[in-house]
């Protein structure tokens, strides 16, 4: 089979397409014939050497959609999924076949194409684990999403809307963000003061922070009494400081979420919760760009340089080897 491989850490130019043996599933595992696989920013970080647990040589990739070939009673089923440590200590989904824990697989949402289903993965699983599982957002509550324009932020906004919560978006962009009731430009506006102004001085019930770094403390100060902040990343400086007295006087709560640490069972449960949202159209994917597998390194380069205009999804069913086919969020 063909697989995208890297034997050293570095830029996307270290990636090579190689012929390797089709893997065999072990106990509790399934072999999936990959039809499409998304590229996430974390895949770029993995190839560059950002993750200390990655062993070489390795096939990257976390998200995929395909057909079960071996290892489960429902062989032939169309599935989608993402697996813990996939592409880190076990070969990932950027290959024609991938072996994953069978428990992580979920039936593909019927309205979605393989390429669209492959694009759900990390953004929506991370968003659900943060907004629903960790923050436990409730109907009528207000949540501040820092980095609302990003892939995980957009997923979180839709999930919060689905849960009947009010969303305030924040980030470095200007202009409206779908699903938000207000947007704060953190380059030109004071985050805390803006939030207090939008909430009549009360603060928000929860913060989902996809950025961290310099946004951490003002986001923490934006919470109401008893509010909670969920953090999944730290852009720039990994260390932050905050007023501990204010923190405990406000009865604030701080939670971290790492999607790499989710168990196969947790991933499967989240996938099952997400499926009705996509099947009913409540959740909608952002546009994707389908790229033939042979041009995987080029797609990686676009993501690394932040030049991709849509989610990059590798396809193994490309008819002519050209690039440029796009799908909107819910086209079949």
Predicted regions and their residues:
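Short amphipathic alpha-helix with an adjacent loop that forms part of the alpha/beta core around
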Residues: 191-201
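Conserved "cap/hinge" positions at secondary-structure junctions
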Residues: 70-72, 83, 102, 147, ...
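NAD(P)H dinucleotide-binding glycine-rich loop of Rossmann-like/cofactor-binding domains
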Residues: 81-147
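Glycine-rich beta-strand-centered segment in the early N-terminal region that forms part
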Residues: 21-38, 48-86
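Glycine-rich phosphate-binding loop and adjacent beta-alpha segment
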Residues: 163, 171, 214-282, 316-332
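Mid-domain Rossmann-like dinucleotide-binding core that forms the NAD(H)/NADP(H) cofactor-binding site
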Residues: 118-189
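N-terminal Rossmann-like NAD(P) cofactor-binding module of classical short-chain dehydrogenase/reductase
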Residues: 80, 207-208
């Amino acid at each position: 089979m063909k697989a995208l491989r890297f034997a050293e850490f570095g830029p996307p130019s270290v990636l090579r397409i190689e012929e390797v043996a089709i893997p065999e599933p072990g106990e509790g595992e399934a072999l999936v014939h990959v039809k499409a696989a998304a590229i996430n920013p974390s895949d770029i970080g993995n190839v560059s050497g950002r993750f200390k647990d990655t062993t070489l040589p390795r096939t990257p990739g976390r998200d995929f959609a395909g057909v079960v070939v071996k290892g489960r009673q429902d062989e032939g089923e169309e599935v989608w999924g993402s697996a813990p440590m996939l592409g880190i200590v076990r070969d990932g989904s950027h290959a024609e076949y991938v072996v994953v824990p069978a428990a992580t697989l979920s039936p593909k949402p019927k309205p979605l194409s393989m390429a669209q289903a492959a694009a759900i993965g990390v953004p929506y699983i991370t968003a659900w684990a943060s907004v629903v599982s960790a923050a436990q957002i409730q109907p009528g509550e207000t949540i501040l999403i820092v980095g609302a324009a990003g892939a995980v932020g957009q997923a979180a906004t839709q999930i919060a809307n689905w849960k009947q919560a009010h969303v305030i978006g924040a980030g470095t962009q200007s202009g409206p963000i779908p699903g938000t009731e207000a947007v704060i430009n953190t380059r030109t506006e004071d985050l805390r003061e803006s939030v207090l102004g939008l909430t009549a001085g009360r603060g928000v019930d929860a913060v989902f922070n996809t950025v961290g770094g310099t946004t951490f403390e003002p986001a923490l100060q934006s919470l109401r009494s008893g509010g909670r902040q969920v953090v999944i990343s730290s852009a720039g400086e990994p260390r932050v400081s905050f007023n501990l007295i204010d923190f405990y006087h406000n009865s604030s709560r701080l939670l971290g979420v790492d999607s790499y640490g989710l168990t196969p069972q947790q991933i499967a449960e989240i996938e099952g919760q997400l499926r009705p949202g996509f099947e009913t159209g409540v959740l909608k994917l952002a546009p994707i760009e389908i790229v033939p597998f042979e041009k995987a390194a080029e797609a990686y380069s676009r993501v690394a340089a932040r030049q991709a205009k849509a989610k990059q999804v590798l396809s193994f069913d490309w008819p002519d080897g050209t690039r440029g086919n796009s799908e909107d969020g819910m086209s079949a």
